[in-house]
Amino acid sequence: MSDSDPAANLDGLRQAIASGDPAARLRAMGCLRPYPAEDCEPLLLACLEDTTVLVRSMACSGLGYKPTAAGTRALRRMLDDEPDPNVRAEAANALARHGGEQASEPLLALYRRDAHWLVRRSIVAALADERDVPAGVLAELADLALADDDVHLQLGGVELLNRLRHDPDRGAAARARLADLRSSDDHRLAAAALESLLPQDPC
């Protein structure tokens, strides 16, 4: 096969990842974008076991963009077993990309038990961006974020409430909470709440 043959190139990436060298693994994972998820899955799963934090983090990111059932299970395991908060945060982001409906409950549970600021910020940002997160999860996560001492999480809570403004069951409560937040002592929080209550441009 020629070097331009996709199968030949994929074989080279497999060899690089099998080498166990962190630099080679990082380069190889960066070249997986053109390949289908089923070809990438075993390579990314292998890199989750690497001792290098950056390799594990990049493997999580790759699994987010190459969703498979095995990848989803592996990411959920990383939420529980991974010791490094940077990797847990990346796993949370990646799992959210598999779909807000299936990721929302595991990520809400992770928020409750993992107090690291980066993990929590990643969860709030990831679920705020997903369209199919159940309204009940958004509401509970907003309450948790707004109760946190971290103003960045509080601002994320405002964004979550904004997502709920027009929900038939939770919209009235979300709008009332946003109205209350306009009088917050923190001008950033008050401004974010005020902006959320302004009429939205339909364009």
Role assignments for model-derived ranges:
Residues 3-16, 37-49, 68-81, 100-113, ...:
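Amphipathic alpha-helical scaffolding segments comprising HEAT/armadillo-like alpha-solenoid repeats
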Residues 12-35:
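Alpha-helical segment of the N-proximal tetratricopeptide repeat
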Residues 22-23, 38, 53-54, 69, ...:
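Alpha-helix N-cap/helix-start positions at coil->helix boundaries
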Residues 26, 42, 57-58, 73, ...:
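Alpha-solenoid HEAT/ARM repeat scaffold
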Residues 26-31, 53-65, 90-93:
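Non-membrane alpha-helical segments in proteins
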Residues 112, 117-118, 125-132, 151:
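Alpha-helical adaptor scaffolds
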